[in-house]
Amino acid sequence: MVTMDNSDKIYDLIGSANNNDVDSQNELVRVFVHNCFIRSVLTFAKPFKWNNIVENAIQDSNYTYFILCFHGHKYNRVKYQEIYKKIIDGLFLRISKSSSLDALTYNNLGFIYHNDIFKKNKVIKVISHYCKAVNMNSKHAQYNLATFIRLNYYKQEFVKLLSKTVFKDSTLPISKEIIFKKIYELYKLSASQFNPNAEHSLSTTCEFREFIGQKERDKWLKKSAKNGLSISQYSIGTKYLGGDVTNRKYQKGIIYLKNSAKQGDTGSQISLINIYSKEYGKNIMTNINEMMYWYLNCEQYTSFFMNIFDVFPIVCNTMEIDNKSNEENQNITNIETIILSKIQLLLVKIKYDCVCNNSITITNILDELENKFFKIIESRQKIQNSSSIFYISQMRLVDSVYQNIIDQQNKTGIIPFVKNYLVDEEIYMSIGFDSIEICDQLEILLNNDMYAENIVELLWRLDELCKEKSYYSKILKITNMLENYRSQVITFLEDNLTLRENYFFKKYKHIQRNYF
């Protein structure tokens, strides 16, 4: 069973549900209804593409509640209005033939009128349906009715309706204090049945101070965060960040923010971006990769990021290299990839700093370095192609071989990115197992040749520069060294191109090559 205590499994459940696995869809709906609201589901689930979603939403009150919660999310109300109309029409036809309804159906009817979903907002019907569900102890209706009253309590006509419905048995005049006491009671009833939204409302509604102390408010906020409400996780996370970074609460704050950010909470994502940017100097690879990860997952920042940088990161790398390693002739492609990823991260950091400091001009030296960086990428591809070491983005592999390469990449820590999407096997050349063996042999030859030419020494020096914290003063040195490295690589390529091609054709002429 999936709960918010093992919420990481929810993402697996969402993936299976989106692939139209019926059991996963049923379980995801059940978990969503039980938790009353899960931000990650609203962010990543695609119920409008599920098979039989209209029929299920008409017949099953759990599915109805589930799909109604998507109505106000992003542009769903406009994008899927035809689907919603079919559901609402079918639902009202079904209930017109039913002699009795369950609590969740009454709640759903109140929600439909409340949010004007193909039914004109009639306040009396909203209150009436919610009250019927509340009388059946629906935690969803308890929360929804409390919220509806809280948003409208100041209107005289609304108070008159309350006197005929919610407060029909009351002998006292209806005052603001009495109204908020009722709101508080409804929230507490809902929270006691596990409703993170109600728990959060108990902790944040200012008018409840007469009924609840700060200690209890904090308790409800923590409970709501533990139960998976992203806004509560964000609130606690930012609250804990006020202390020293080594403080235990600070580290807990990071965990809360990450849990919220994973669900798609923009505020948490932006907070993490800023935190890892400031912490850059302490750990170049960990912190900048973290910053980039949340940057690329932050919907609000993605378009902004694309306008600042020419492309998304080509490589994000968690692997380190050791020039004192006992391993003879470490793989030069791995070394080069790691160093180039560091250089690009330096560029990202510098440009990010310029943006955050409201700097209008990004200096020519940065553009020059970025230009040289991409020329290095091109040079590396030329080397690999010249020796028939097919770069993974230029070949299509049978599934088993493709998976083998991906597994190997996962072991090395190198994850290729191009334009913010993982390599897509649909664009690759089709080759077989023999070709993989050929590539391995030729890569060893290339590796040995480049070591023999002492080209790799430049890479070690580059890596040392990238490790230094005062990277601003090292930009020019890195730029010059990159140019030196590139010129040597190109010279090496030109000198060896014919020899290496002849070697390939002579030894492996039985292999058919299908170039684009």
Curated annotation (Swiss-Prot):
GO terms (BP aspect): ERAD pathway
Superkingdom of origin: Viruses
UniProt Sel1-like repeat ranges: 103-138, 230-265
Gene3D superfamilies reported for this sequence: Tetratricopeptide repeat domain
Record keywords, A-Z: Repeat
InterPro entries from the UniProt entry: Sel1-like, Sel1_AlgK, TPR-like_helical_dom_sf
Listed name of the protein: Putative sel1-like repeat-containing protein R850
Organism encoding this protein: Acanthamoeba polyphaga mimivirus
